[in-house]
Amino acid sequence: MPSKTKYNLVDDGHDLRIPLHNEDAFQHGISFEAKYVGSLDVPRPNSRVEIVAAMRRIRYEFKAKNIKKKKVSIMVSVDGVKVILKKKKKKKEWTWDESKMLVMQDPIYRIFYVSHDSQDLKIFSYIARDGASNIFRCNVFKSKKKSQAMRIVRTVGQAFEVCHKLSLQHTQQNADGQEDGESERNSDGSGDPGRQLTGAERVSTAAAEETDIDAVEVPLPGNDILEFSRGVTDLDAVGKDGGSHIDSTVSPHPQEPMLTASPRMLLPSSSSKPPGLGTGTPLSTHHQMQLLQQLLQQQQQQTQVAVAQVHLLKDQLAAEAAARLEAQARVHQLLLQNKDMLQHISLLVKQVQELELKLSGQNTMGSQDSLLEITFRSGALPVLCESTTPKPEDLHSPLLGAGLADFAHPAGSPLGRHDCLVKLECFRFLPPEDTQPMMAQGEPLLGGLELIKFRESGIASEYESNTDESEERDSWSQEELPRLLNVLQRQELGDSLDDEIAV
């Protein structure tokens, strides 16, 4: 690589538009030094990702097997890529056998792909196809420098271009040679007075003969190219011999068309013809048979497509039927659950009605209790106490000492409850001081018991929410003493919640 100077800051070696080597150098071969990592058979790659993956897999497998890299010399030419093992020469050994040192050799047209690893630019590889087995083989190499690997890859790519140009030149030269030969044959044929065919007729006849040979399709495996070249060689020989052979072929059968006579001219033996195609079979019939065969193949393919679509529709119908059955099973399960819930609800309604009938039978007023009343009602009617009612044990009144001495509240008494829904209010009318002895003789005190009234909906009229109730209940137990003075034991609460009792 030329060194960069002050006026040469651009490296043309990395420019893909500029060729690396002269095209004449590929005739002799361009040599590179590298290290051979290894080779493995790979399936036909479809993308660069698969190629890079195969390259890395080969590297890791050979590294795991502890196989050392070999120093090789890579020769790139128009003949192909040749890999030769590089060894030091011994002093006594003047020459060596190149076949023993040859590692591999692949022609250019069999090389499938050449590239380097994007992660490690020193690693490059090419994939070649084996001519005998058509197996793709990946060969991995490693160079000393990244630039060297890039030059090798670009050199192999340039060898493709050079071979393509050479093939185009060869085809053009062959075409020119054929045109020159035809012009010479035309000039020779025009000088022969006994010749009946002109040059244009010969060209059309040759075209018809070649078409007829292709239409015959001789069933000889592997000899299609040889048969075609042999026919062309016979045609050239006929043109060189002159018109005597053609006249001798055409004159015994003056009424026979040219197309039926041409296979006899080109094909040496009649045994190579198919048994179904005779000399009198017209060419159009054969083409019609080919057309019918192609139409039949097309119909078969369409039938296969239709069958595949039918199978797909059947699968879709089966999936939809399974989904529908599953949905029906779920709906049936939901219906059963709904039925059980309805039965349970009807049972609850019957129980509620029985409770209402029992309560209405005990009620003297005949009022109908609501569901909320039945829910909150217990066996012993609870008592609701206000926060302002003083507690009985904290009262210090000498007037009530004798009256309360013989009064004891049982455990189930409404007066022994704190969390209750009955409101007791006591009020007393204190007589003058001169009448206090009369009260001590056993006159009853005046008190009041007020029950909370319920609406038909079951909601209390005085306390609208449960939160207020709970707050007031807490305040009853923590605030002032209750105002309950005395309730006689012989008096009982009413049966109905709508009644007010005054004692």
Curated annotation (Swiss-Prot):
Gene Ontology terms: biological process:
postsynaptic actin cytoskeleton organization; regulation of heart rate by chemical signal; regulation of ventricular cardiac muscle cell membrane repolarization
Entry GO MF terms = nitric-oxide synthase binding
What this chain does, per the record? Adapter protein involved in neuronal nitric-oxide (NO) synthesis regulation via its association with nNOS/NOS1. The complex formed with NOS1 and synapsins is necessary for specific NO and synapsin functions at a presynaptic level. Mediates an indirect interaction between NOS1 and RASD1 leading to enhance the ability of NOS1 to activate RASD1. Competes with DLG4 for interaction with NOS1, possibly affecting NOS1 activity by regulating the interaction between NOS1 and DLG4. In kidney podocytes, plays a role in podosomes and filopodia formation through CDC42 activation.
Q: Which residues form a coiled coil?
A: 318-359
* Protein name, entry field: Carboxyl-terminal PDZ ligand of neuronal nitric oxide synthase protein
Q: Which gene encodes it?
A: Nos1ap
Q: Organism, per UniProt?
A: Mus musculus
Pfam families according to UniProt: PID
Enumerate the SMART domains for this protein: PTB
